[in-house]
Amino acid sequence: MQDRQKAQDYRALLLADTPLIDVRAPIEFEQGAMPGAINLPLMMDNERAAVGTCYKRQGADAALALGHRLVCGDIRQQRLEAWKAAYQRFPNGYLCCARGGQRSHIVQRWLQETGIDCPLIEGGYKALRQTAIQATWQLAQKPILLIGGCTGSGKTQLVRQQPNGVDLEGLARHRGSSFGRTLNPQLSQASFENKLAVELLKINAHQTLKRWVLEDEGRTIGANHLPECLRERMAQAPIAVVEDPFALRLERLREEYFIRMHHDFTHAYGDEAGWQAYSEYLHHGLFAIRRRLGLQRFAELTDTLDRALAEQLSNGSTDGHMAWLVPLLNEYYDPMYRYQLEKKAANIVFRGPWQDVANWLKAQ
């Protein structure tokens, strides 16, 4: 066990999906955490704030004493039981606090008093975070190929099929468009970046990489920003463009926006609440681009959406949605993407239907 006491091989820890018992306060965990970490705080947000104020006014010894007074008795025992249960569930896990300082050492000592010898991360979350940032910068230097195409071209599916493909939208829990949100909330920016770094490390470790295959994304995917080092490389990367028939794109979007999302919402919340959430999801997607559509056009498409939802609720048909989706593609999404693609025309190395692009990728 001794060699695990103060782990410092941070890349190996990230590659192994090492369980982390993160004892930072919930607010710290929400701001940024490593994939697979579970948050079992030594101090809750209000307790941490009180200790921090005490530290500034009275010094370290007084702050430490206050911390022990706040986390004592039943509170201490409840948290200790939670840490014990977590270690029993993840015997290969590590304790982690912000910098590998007092919080993880205190929890480690309390666990040792119960007979559990749980190692900790030397340097804490900050060290793991810095490792993730460095790994992303380093791995982003490898060649990149982008998959482009208008909305509904099946780009994400194509990326997922590549052994060296990185599904940025999957990592961001968002499909990129105003209708791109999923039932899973997006991670914080730091947590997204950490997850991306681990994904890059894993793929790099298991593939003989000539290049990464990524979807042609903007600077943001929903609320998450792509790391600047990756964006800079993507801006220079060659692009293979999927050009599928409009009707085929519509069918993909029907499946994605209407059939699958309706299923997911009702599966998660039940028929009535799920339908309400699904309706709000579509309305929110349209509302998000109202200024670019113009308020009159937005109002017209909203009325059409309402009629389509009424038809779907009545007989299950999603055909009515085409009456607002088709003009939305023709008037907004397609012109916007084509304008963006024109600025990168010199980077286009191949274009064709989905299957032709897939075959071309295999031949590279």
UniProtKB/Swiss-Prot annotation:
Bilayer-spanning residue ranges: none
Top EC class for this record: transferase
GO MF annotation list: transferase activity, transferring alkyl or aryl (other than methyl) groups; tRNA 2-selenouridine synthase activity
Residue intervals of the Rhodanese domain: 14-137
Active site: C97
SMART domains (UniProt xref): RHOD
Family annotation (Pfam families): Rhodanese
Catalysed transformations (reactions): 5-methylaminomethyl-2-thiouridine(34) in tRNA + selenophosphate + (2E)-geranyl diphosphate + H2O + H(+) = 5-methylaminomethyl-2-selenouridine(34) in tRNA + (2E)-thiogeraniol + phosphate + diphosphate; 5-methylaminomethyl-2-thiouridine(34) in tRNA + (2E)-geranyl diphosphate = 5-methylaminomethyl-S-(2E)-geranyl-thiouridine(34) in tRNA + diphosphate; 5-methylaminomethyl-S-(2E)-geranyl-thiouridine(34) in tRNA + selenophosphate + H(+) = 5-methylaminomethyl-2-(Se-phospho)selenouridine(34) in tRNA + (2E)-thiogeraniol; 5-methylaminomethyl-2-(Se-phospho)selenouridine(34) in tRNA + H2O = 5-methylaminomethyl-2-selenouridine(34) in tRNA + phosphate
Recorded superkingdom: Bacteria
Similarity remark: Belongs to the SelU family.
Protein name (database record): tRNA 2-selenouridine synthase
